Amino acid sequence: MEAARGRLGPEQDLSTGADHQAVTFSGRPSRTLSKPPSARTLSGEEEAESVGVASRHPRPSPKTSSGSIAHRPELDTWEDKPSARATPSGARGSRGTSGSEHTPPPSSWYPEPEPSEDQPSALTVCRRGSPGGVEMNVELPQQEGDDDDDGDDEEAADRAGHSFPSRLQDSRSLDGLSGACGGGGSSSSGEAGAGGGRRATISSPLELEGTVSRHGDLTHFVANNLQLKIRLSGAPSPVPPASGRPCLTPAPTPTIPPIDPDVLRDLERLSRELGGRVDRLLCGLGGAVQELTALSVGCIQTYRDAVDSLGEAVDMSIKGMYTLLARCEELERALQPVQGLARQVRDIRRTLEVLEALCK
């Protein structure tokens, strides 16, 4: 037990006639008081008795062991506010009773764990003597006009809120993700229990819903009860029952601005112009298609007539060739007697040549 935190400071004077008091102050860390509350001097016996009561009710604290007085080190002065109120929890004359209606439990005699950075800490001062003492609770309400403290709290909350996504973005592995989600406080417990539990992997959520198998870089997943899941996903969601209590919050008013009628008229006019242009475009496109169709039909008919004429010409040439061949055969048969006459003429010439030779 520390002397500065477990005992009261220098003797103080109490203006009231009570022998034993419990005073509780609550406020923000940055609050300051212009003057402390008045108190009377405690005797050495009462201080020893107060220390004995605190030692009989030990309570573990995350920071230091607590006594009958607990305060944060950064709060040095107290703020005197006109709205502070003191409420006696028991009669001043009844000192022999074991407690009063508002006497706090023994657990409230000791400081609570130190709050986090995002929450304002509360200062609690408990000074108790005998079990039948008088308790006074003094509350210091928060100031609404303290803009500096509110700004500091908001900046601390923003830093605490942005630190978690930044840690998630910087981590590149599942171990980093799990460490970022668990926080710095759970790192030691995670290291201690790493041997007993299974490490988180990518397929651990999939293994709960089906079978996962890996082949190289490919991961195959087979879902269990696929038909049931499809049937459940297609089922309509149940309509929540209408509550009998009327809705206290008014329905949100639509934020759609009023529509300008000139805009509607311009839109209608432009739509009509666009429709007329589209109609004219479709008509021109239809006429062009008809002209192309007629030209295609004319080309097809011309090609058909040319093919028919060419076929007839080829047929006529084939017929003339066969006719010529037939005439040549007839001529050959007609020239066969001419060859006999040619032989006779050659014989007559030889005979004439012999006769001429004899006459000389």
From Swiss-Prot:
The modification Phosphoserine is found at residues 130, 173, 204. As part of the BORC complex may play a role in lysosomes movement and localization at the cell periphery. Associated with the cytosolic face of lysosomes, the BORC complex may recruit ARL8B and couple lysosomes to microtubule plus-end-directed kinesin motor. One of its GO terms (molecular function) is identical protein binding. Residues 179-198 have a biased composition (Gly residues). InterPro entries: BORCS6, BORCS6_C. Residues 89-100 have a biased composition (Low complexity). The modification Phosphothreonine is found at residues 41, 201. GO terms for biological process: lysosome localization. It comes from the Eukaryota. Residues 23-35 have a biased composition (Polar residues). This is BLOC-1-related complex subunit 6. Residues 1-10, 71-83 have a biased composition (Basic and acidic residues). Keywords: Lysosome, Membrane, Phosphoprotein. It holds the Pfam family BORCS6. Residues 144-156 have a biased composition (Acidic residues). The lineage of its organism: Eukaryota, Metazoa, Chordata, Craniata, Vertebrata. It is found in: Lysosome membrane. Component of the BLOC-one-related complex (BORC) which is composed of BLOC1S1, BLOC1S2, BORCS5, BORCS6, BORCS7, BORCS8, KXD1 and SNAPIN. Belongs to the BORCS6 family. One of its GO terms (cellular component) is BORC complex. Residues 1-201 are annotated as: Disordered.
